[in-house]
Structure formats: structure tokens, C-alpha cells
């Protein structure tokens, strides 16, 4: 369940100014292929290629051009990036704009990832995944195609993927000062003990849980707490405890989209490739997707990813995936997950919703793919492989078992009769209110998203005037956004709490009831607090009386 705190109007105004001042969108515009020309000392480049596991940064001059700008930047850090791609002939690179010039960024970005996509003859699979995640409102990296030149030579068509770091956090979260962990294999979120040090990197110097912000404090206590709750909490208190520290709806959407795109290089199958961000202002974790070149029919395990069971996704080692298992074992979460899958299958994922986007990107990148010699070096992919990767007919070459359109059509058809609902009580999975810090005369506008497999028939705000134990009821109305790809907008209910008056403290919660009369109250773990500034009206009256 997501509880989003909305700032007062004057803070919202400041925040909106900051958003509009962020020019990073110009780096991720799909209207043309960007061009980056990197000039580096040839001896440095040779050293980088001779030491592929090194993360040493070397100075380079970068000329970056697209529809919006044409600029040259000196003293940019340059190195290889990635895991298995380091040994590929078509390598992936990282540009670091503030390593040699501290504090510098480039159109709001301190770092840019240039991914070679050596596994993918289409050079588009990960880009399509990022676009789908953005369509459904999951906070994730932006991506665009880019032509890479090094010392005058064309190194091929790449995908520029937004780096997840403190700049990413600042663009996407109200409070960007929290701990961010990069989670790589074998990041299975299993319990190792109560001591936060039990979760310090233990497989190697960085894996599986690598703290990427606030490294000086090196505090793993929040992560240890989350993992303990996932693994040690009894079933009867599991939802209350988990929702108090974690945005459950985010990981359910992540699971649903991964199942649809065949994204197996993830937590559920491979205990790999995700970020966890602890946002301090709400003391809760966010789930951030990562790395999607292995999708849409790319397979190394002889598994038909168009036909996997969405409730029992394959697990490479047969080991525990406690988070996924416990979410699927809880009927409310299982039904919400099924609802997300059904909504995406009806409103987002079928080709009718995004085939034109695929066609546009294909036409845009074809000339650059045609002259990309490096894309042929690792697996011998030809231009025909590039073209057939977009086919709705059967295509197969080595680890690429399906064309993209073929995969999508088969995956959609595979869900016929598969989704099942348990009839669990309804759930409220998103709560938004504004203003967060109301003035005495402000009404508080509440928006929630709720789902029940037996329909949601009644939603009521329960408002408590502190310290009075009784509540006042304010009804909410079903108010969905038509033709939206955001499931939470389709499940939207709205209501209003009248002005509280001066110096008041109150609390509210949401009561939701389905067509079978099953009811529940959210948030489960605590009511939401509202406060207004000033002196309470009754105290003011007494003071005035005494003054007379």
C-alpha cells in the first residue's frame, strides 16, 4: 500500500519550478538518435580494454549532440560498465561528468550509462521495457538510443540508460536523502540474522547489497529490518508489518510487468537486478527495476517465457524467494497482483497499444544499426537478425527464441483462463491527500485507489478529532480517470475532509467494503495524522474572556 505525502501549495509551487528547471528530459527524447563522440588518449583506451574488470575512470572529451543541444564537455570520466558485458566485443561504457570536476552535471545528469546490448539483435528490448514501466507509473530509468563514436570510429548503436543515483532520487522522490541499495545476484532477501552487518556485502566486495548513498554512515539497519519483516513476521501480522515499511504495490507491479515481458534477470528468477530505496520522510522502502536486455524471448535456460505460470514464476536454484512466496500466499496481495496483470493485459501490454511506438523506433534506429559492425561480433547477428527480431512470425537464433511481436502475442494469449481471484477482502493500495500541512481554513482532499475481486461498493473516510475516540464519516465517490494506463487512476475514489480549524490535530483512515459486505480499514498499521497551526478556537475564547 502506498501512502504519499503531498506538500503545501507553496512547497508544491517551489517543487514544480525545480521540475521545470530540470533539463534532463532533453537527454531522453525519442525524436532522433543522439550522437556522442568520445575522445580519449589511445593508451588509456587500450588499458581499459586490457583491464575489463577495472572501474578506473580515465579523462575524456565528450561531444554530445541531439535536436536540443550540441556541446563539448572536457574532463569527463570514462570507463567500462556492466557485468558479463565487460567481456563482450561490443562493450558498455559509463560517462561520469563530476568525477574530475566535482559538482558538475550535464543537463541534470552526473552520470550516463551507454549500454551496448550485445545480447539483443534488436537493440531495443530494454528500451521497450523501460517505456512500459513508465507507462504504468513505476519509477524507473529513462532510456533512448544513441550513436557512439570513440576517437573518430563508430562503435555502434547503443542505448543510453538513466543512472540510478542521488540525482535520480532527487528527480523522483520528495525526500532524496535516504539509503539506496543496488541489489545484484545473489540478492534473494533471505534472513541472515538481526545484526545489520550480516547484510554487508558478503559474496564479494559489492554483492549482493551494495549501499550507493550515505556511504560514510554505512548503515544497513533499515535493510536488515526490512529483511527481518519479510522473513520472520507471522502470517497474521505480515501485511500490517510489511506495509509499514514497504510499498507493496510497487513490487507487485514489478512482478506483473516482468512476467509479461519475460524479464527473468530479476529478483524472482535470478535474485538479481533491482534497487531498494529507503525514503526517510515516510520511513518506507521503494522498489526500483534495473537491467532489461534479457527480455521478450531472450533465454539461456530452455524455458518458454511466453507460457510461465504468473503465480509460480521459475526459480533458477529452487531456493527461497520469500518475498514473492509470501505475497502470493496472501490472498489480498495475490488478488491485487492478478488485478494488475489483468489491467495491463487489457490496457497496456497488447500490441494494439504500442505497436506504432515500436515501428517509429525501428525506423529511427535502422540506419544506425545497419552500419553497426560491433553488433555482429559477439553472436554473428546479421542485419536480417535485427529485422526479424521485430517480427510477429517465428524467429529464433541461438539464445534469442522469439521475435518481439511474436513474444508479446504469445504471452497475451497464454493468459486465457489463467488469472484467478480468491475473493479476498478489498484492499486500499494508494492513499494521497493534500495539503499535507493544512491551514485552518483548508479542506483536505483525499484520493485513494482500492480493489476488490468482488468489486468495491463503499469507501468512507473515518475522521477522528483528537482526543475524541469517535469518528465522523465522510463518503468517497468512485472517480476513475478514463482511458488511463495507470491502474491506480482507474481504481480512484475521491473525498473531502472539511477544514479543521485553528490549532487542531486529527486523524483519518479509510474504510472500504466490497459487494459481499467484506470490509477493511487502511492504513493497517496507523491512522494518518493531520495538524493545523495556530491556537485552538476554544482556547482563544477562554483567553479573550479572561482578558476582559
Predicted segments — roles?
Residues 8-16:
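Bacterial N-terminal signal peptides
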Residues 459-502, 515-519:
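Aromatic- and glycine-rich beta-strand/loop motifs that create alpha-glucan
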Residues 94-102, 109, 116-117, 136-141, ...:
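Internal "kinase-insert"/substrate-recognition segments embedded within catalytic cores
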Residues 24-26, 31-35, 44-46, 72-76, ...:
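Middle-to-C-terminal accessory/interaction subdomains
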Residues 437-439, 446-455, 465-467, 512-514:
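Extracellular acidic, Ser/Thr/Pro-rich low-complexity tracts
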Residues 58, 504-508:
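Exposed beta-strand face motif in extracellular beta-rich ectodomains
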Residues 531-548:
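A structural motif detector for short, solvent-exposed N-terminal "entry" segments of globular domains
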Amino acid at each position: 500500500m502506498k501512502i504519499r505525502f503531498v506538500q503545501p501549495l507553496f512547497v508544491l509551487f517551489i517543487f514544480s519550478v525545480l521540475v521545470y528547471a530540470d533539463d534532463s528530459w532533453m537527454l531522453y527524447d525519442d525524436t532522433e538518435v543522439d550522437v556522442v563522440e568520445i575522445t580519449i588518449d589511445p593508451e588509456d583506451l587500450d588499458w581499459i580494454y586490457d583491464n575489463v574488470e577495472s572501474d578506473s575512470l580515465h579523462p575524456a572529451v565528450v561531444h554530445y549532440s541531439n535536436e536540443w543541444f550540441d556541446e563539448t564537455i572536457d574532463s569527463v570520466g570514462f570507463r567500462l560498465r556492466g557485468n558479463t558485458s565487460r567481456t563482450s566485443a561490443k562493450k558498455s561504457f559509463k560517462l561520469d561528468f563530476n568525477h574530475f570536476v566535482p559538482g558538475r552535471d550535464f543537463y541534470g545528469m552526473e552520470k550516463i550509462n551507454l549500454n551496448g546490448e550485445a545480447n539483443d539483435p534488436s537493440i531495443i528490448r530494454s528500451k521497450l521495457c523501460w517505456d512500459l514501466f513508465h507507462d504504468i507509473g513505476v519509477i524507473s530509468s529513462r532510456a533512448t538510443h544513441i550513436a557512439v563514436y570513440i576517437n573518430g570510429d563508430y562503435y555502434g548503436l547503443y542505448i543510453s540508460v538513466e543512472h540510478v543515483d542521488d540525482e535520480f532520487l532527487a528527480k523522483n522522490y520528495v525526500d532524496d536523502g535516504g539509503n539506496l541499495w543496488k541489489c545484484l545476484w545473489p540478492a534473494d532477501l533471505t534472513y541472515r540474522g538481526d545484526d545489520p552487518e550480516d547484510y554487508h556485502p558478503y559474496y564479494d566486495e559489492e554483492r549482493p547489497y551494495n549501499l550507493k548513498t550515505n556511504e560514510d554512515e554505512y548503515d544497513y539497519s533499515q535493510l536488515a529490518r526490512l529483511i527481518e519483516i519479510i522473513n520472520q513476521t507471522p502470517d497474521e501480522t505480515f501485511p500490517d508489518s510489511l506495509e509499514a515499511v514497504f510499498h507493496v504495490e510497487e513490487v507487485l507491479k514489478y512482478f506483473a510487468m516482468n512476467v509479461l515481458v519475460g524479464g527473468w534477470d530479476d529478483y524472482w528468477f535470478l535474485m538479481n537486478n533491482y534497487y531498494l530505496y529507503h525514503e526517510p520522510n515516510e520511513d518506507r522502502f521503494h522498489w526500483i527495476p534495473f537491467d532489461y536486455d534479457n527480455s521478450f524471448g531472450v533465454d539461456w535456460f530452455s524455458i518458454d517465457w511466453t507460457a510461465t505460470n504468473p503465480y509460480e514464476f521459475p526459480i533458477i536454484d529452487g531456493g527461497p524467494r520469500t518475498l514473492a512466496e509470501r505475497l502470493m500466499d496472501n490472498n489480498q496481495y495475490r488478488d491485487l497482483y492478478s488485478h494488475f496483470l489483468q489491467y495491463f493485459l487489457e490496457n497496456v501490454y497488447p500490441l494494439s497499444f504500442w505497436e506504432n511506438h515500436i515501428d517509429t523506433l525501428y525506423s529511427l534506429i535502422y540506419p544506425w544499426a545497419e552500419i553497426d559492425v560491433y553488433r555482429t561480433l559477439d553472436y554473428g547477428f546479421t542485419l536480417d537478425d535485427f529485422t526479424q527480431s521485430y517480427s510477429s512470425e517465428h524467429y529464433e537464433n541461438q539464445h534469442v527464441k522469439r521475435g518481439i511481436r511474436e513474444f508479446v502475442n504469445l504471452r497475451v494469449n497464454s493468459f486465457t483462463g489463467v488469472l484467478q481471484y480468491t475473493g479476498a477482502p478489498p484492499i486500499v493500495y494508494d492513499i494521497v491527500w493534500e495539503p499535507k500541512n493544512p491551514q485552518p481554513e483548508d479542506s483536505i482532499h483525499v484520493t485513494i485507489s482500492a480493489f476488490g475481486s468482488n468489486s468495491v461498493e463503499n469507501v468512507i473516510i473515518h475522521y477522528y478529532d483528537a482526543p475524541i475516540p469517535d469518528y465522523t464519516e465522510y463518503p468517497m465517490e468512485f472517480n476513475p480517470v478514463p482511458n488511463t494506463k495507470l491502474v491506480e487512476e482507474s481504481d480512484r475514489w475521491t473525498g473531502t475532509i472539511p477544514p479543521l480549524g485553528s490549532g487542531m490535530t486529527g486523524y483519518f483512515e479509510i474504510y472500504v467494503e466490497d459487494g459481499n459486505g467484506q470490509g477493511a480499514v487502511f492504513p493497517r498499521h496507523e491512522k494518518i495524522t493531520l495538524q493545523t497551526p495556530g491556537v485552538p478556537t476554544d482556547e482563544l475564547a477562554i483567553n479573550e474572556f479572561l482578558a476582559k
